[in-house]
Amino acid sequence: RVPGGFLPDEDQGFLLACLILKPNTSLQVAYEQDKKFEAALQDPAVKNLTTVVGLNILNSVQTPGACIAYIELKDWSERPETSAELAGKLQGKLAQAGRDGMAMVLEPPAIPGVGTANGVTMVLEDLEGQGVAYLHEQVQRFQEAASRRPEIALCMDMMMADMPQKYVNLDKEKCKFHKVDIDVANGILASYNGSSFINYFNAFGQQWQVYIQAQGEDRASLEKMDGFFVTNADGARVPLSALVNIREIEDTEFVMHHNIYNAAKLNVMPRPGHSTQQVMDALKEVFHQTMDPTKVGFDYQDMSFQENKVRNSIGLRAI
């Protein structure tokens, strides 16, 4: 039986490479890692190389600990390898270079604009809303089982649930003790550490927006909240630091939604000699072996969504 698929990958003359660094990596560190990343991607078959720091293209989010590279290849007549062969070659060079994170080289999707890379894009959904920690646990279990399948070369989850963060809780009892309106305190906390829209104004033939927020140096650390004050019922100024509780936590950097549920995306690459259809069948088997379908659901995105839709709507006919 010949393995089936949706559309075959083609040599489009360019590749994508993505570098995901460890949680809480600063932009400055990412710039240093990007130099090593760019050096490892140099090859006689590469015509131009452009890197962007601070963008995770697989999840379409801006994050300081990620880099993306657009690799333009030389004309087919000037290089002996196909784009698929070059992707494997560059992936090996990245592995040898040593890096503080995860890197991958990807071919673009067969249909431009439908997703960001080839392979299979699967989504696991938290149907009961049990929270990010529960979803991450299910994703890890699914990923471990899927990685053992012979059809699958690589199964990556983009849900980083161990991002070090600071949880700031506005204490109601402290607000009551200091005679501070909790809504006012919450507004100041959000406006100074985030931003708040004020209004529009017209000038120089254009319409402008007005926002307020604290200066960058005053938002660099939570200790700076000693300089933010709230006026209480007696007219006295109370520092925000006296109204909040702060603790260290680990949580996800972002949460994606799919079909109204919290979800996690998996990027899955077929092993050579296997089609995306075989990979999708393998993933479905793994799902039913490891997941409770009443608590966790699954779906596809990008090219995989189209492939699954075609498989479910068009039957095989023989004349």
Question: What is the role of each PLM region?
Answer:
Residues 1-24, 78, 105, 118:
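Transmembrane helices with small-residue packing motifs
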Residues 2-9, 55-61, 106-115, 153-158, ...:
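Short beta-strand/turn micro-motifs at beta-sheet edges
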Residues 10-14, 62-68, 115-117, 163, ...:
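Short, solvent-exposed loop/turn segments at the edges of secondary structure
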Residues 11-35, 43, 124:
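Membrane-interface junction motifs in transport/secretion proteins
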Residues 14-21, 66-72, 104, 119-126, ...:
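Active-site-flanking beta-strand signature of metal-NTP-handling nucleotidyl enzymes
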Residues 22, 54-55, 72-74, 127, ...:
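Residue-level recognition of strand-loop junctions within catalytic nucleotide-signaling folds
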Residues 28-116, 128, 132-144, 173-195, ...:
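Solvent-exposed, membrane-proximal periplasmic/extracellular interface segments of envelope transport
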Residues 102, 140-319:
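Extracytoplasmic/periplasmic membrane-proximal domains and adjacent transmembrane bundles
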